[in-house]
Amino acid sequence: AINAPASGRMAVAEAITNLLAAPIELPRVKLSANWMAACGEPGEDAALYETVKAVGMELCPALGVSIPVGKDSLSMRTQWSEGSDKKKVTSPVSLIVSAFASLSDVRGTLTPQLNATEADTTLVLIDLGKGQNRMGGSILGQTLDQSGDVVPDVDDPQDLVNLVNAVNALRAKGQILAYHDRSDGGLLAAAAEMAFAGHVGVALNVDLLVTEGDGVSDSRMDTGDAKNWAGQVSARREELTLKALFNEELGVLLQVRTAERNDVMQTLREHGLSKFSHFVGKTRPVSSEIDAGKGELQVWRDAKAVFSAPLADLHQVWDAVSWKICQQRDNPVNADAEHAAAGEPTDPGLHVHLTFDAADNVAAPYLNLAKPKVAILREQGVNSHIEMAYAFTEAGFEAFDVHMTDLQTGRVKLEDFKGVVA
């Protein structure tokens, strides 16, 4: 069943995990909320009320963020007739969230682009869904024409607060090389997009994500008679693998140096996140000592590669929809050329090639570093001349206190100054 309050909570949470690529502080985060619903339809008013309550009165206060601005679109339905048949499409309650925050320092902003110069790095998944892998509303479900029953949710706002604090702590230590939130398409899509951006191969390992129970007191893997157990376990493992790769629970994927991953896990432990943080993969840059997986996206389970494909092929598929739209909107020749370059390892993309040394100050030979002299005229009844002199001094001038009698007697000449302030 559709869970309107959960969708609202997830909209806020995903806006924050998107923003977390920058060094944000939660008290500085402000949200713009666009509430959309088909008011008057059965159950929709109640769903809207519950969603507003969940977001505005529960989640946001718990996170310490505010919603100073927003709008509403409360007629989200359309009706028409086809002959004697009346048709109607009604949209579910939706919340569109835009997040913004002022930063004390814009440096330290992270991107999804995998670092290609580090030879040995690890991917760390911080799974705020805590292994529930709820598939309702997922992209995978939609491709199979299924909406699902149980949807992802923000079960504990404190986990999100802890995530922000942990990522900022790791950022301050310089231990995060790349960052991407898990959202549309799940873990596999996030890893693929990071690999596309960096032209770096990735080998994911889902062993820790497909384990159920402890095998002793919790034996969820015991799904039937012993004679069918092997087949049932195999089918269940396939299902769990798909859920691990494509669930869209709240979470983030980090690239860290393998030599520092234990330190990273200790930081996550200090912020209460280690129990649901996992080492889920390794990168395969050109400089990697392991050749298998270079230029590919692989998924490993039980010491076997259950999926492997060249990054270039996956990038072409990933770009296909945008390419088709671009063909209709822009010059088709340019659209085709851009699509052909998608995933090409030798394509440098947008880049800068300077024909000079950026460290050189080309204006230096022409600069006159002498401070211009400026006369601050003073006469009886004048005030603020001291503040004016201070302002010009701070601006790089050499300020002189000049009284009108100085000019009358010839002690000072205006021709000696570059400017006069009166």
Q: Each PLM stretch: what is its role?
A:
Residues L254:
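Catalytic core of tubulin tyrosine ligase-like
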Residues P23, D181, V420-A422:
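Catalytic nucleophile loop
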Residues I24, L273, F397:
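Short phosphate-binding/catalytic loops that engage adenosine nucleotides
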Residues I386, A391-A422:
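Flexible gly/pro-rich beta->alpha loop and the following alpha-helix that scaffold active-site loops
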Residues A1, L48-T51, S66-E248, R257-K373, ...:
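Intein/HINT protein-splicing elements and their conserved insertion hotspots or analogous self-processing inserts
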Residues A15, L19, K373, N383-H385, ...:
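Core alpha-helical transmembrane segments of integral membrane proteins
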Residues I2-T78:
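A glycine-rich phosphate/pyrophosphate-binding beta-strand-loop-alpha-helix module
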